Amino acid sequence: MKKFSMIAAGALAAGLSFSAMAADTYQLDPNHTYPSFEADHFGGVSTWRGKFNKSSGTVVLDRAAKTGTMDVTIDVSSINTGNAKLDEHLQKAEFFDAAKYPTAVYKGTSIRFDGDKPAEVVGSLTMHGVTKPLNLKIESFKCFVNPMMKKEVCGTEATATFDRGDFGMDYGKTYGFSLKTVLHIQAEGVKQ
């Protein structure tokens, strides 16, 4: 009996240590996740700003191994610049071509840590039918137990910069528009 108890205790300890080391999955909360952007208007005359109202995704985070992955899908027809005519234009073929390419997808293949906090997501962005490498710099990251949901929630602010012309979206270049685009992501994920 004593031998069985020792084996059971060992199995329990092994199971607990395995689950403590296992990666956690977080579902992005669509009510607290806002992919947004800044883009040039007429070579520095002003800056367009907008966001996407519909996005979904998951983040797998292994804090013990200091790595993780990310998979996010953005509905490009949910673009919102605060200007209905501009939103319509941005959905046309010279920009997102939402009829042909209804989503933009970010796939993070690894997450780099600085100490015990995520610092950068290494991955790629697929937009307008083109996939290019794009790393997200994590500006802030914090987790807490949400008192209403009784679940862990992690929030982040991340940024990246890219040339939209690399994705076949070079409208305005002949008018002097800079194609540099700054991506800002404010996100919260709920532990599953």
List where the protein language model places each region.
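Gram-negative bacterial Sec-dependent N-terminal signal peptides
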Residues: M1-A22
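Low-complexity, acidic/polar, glycine-enriched regions of mature
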Residues: A20-Q192
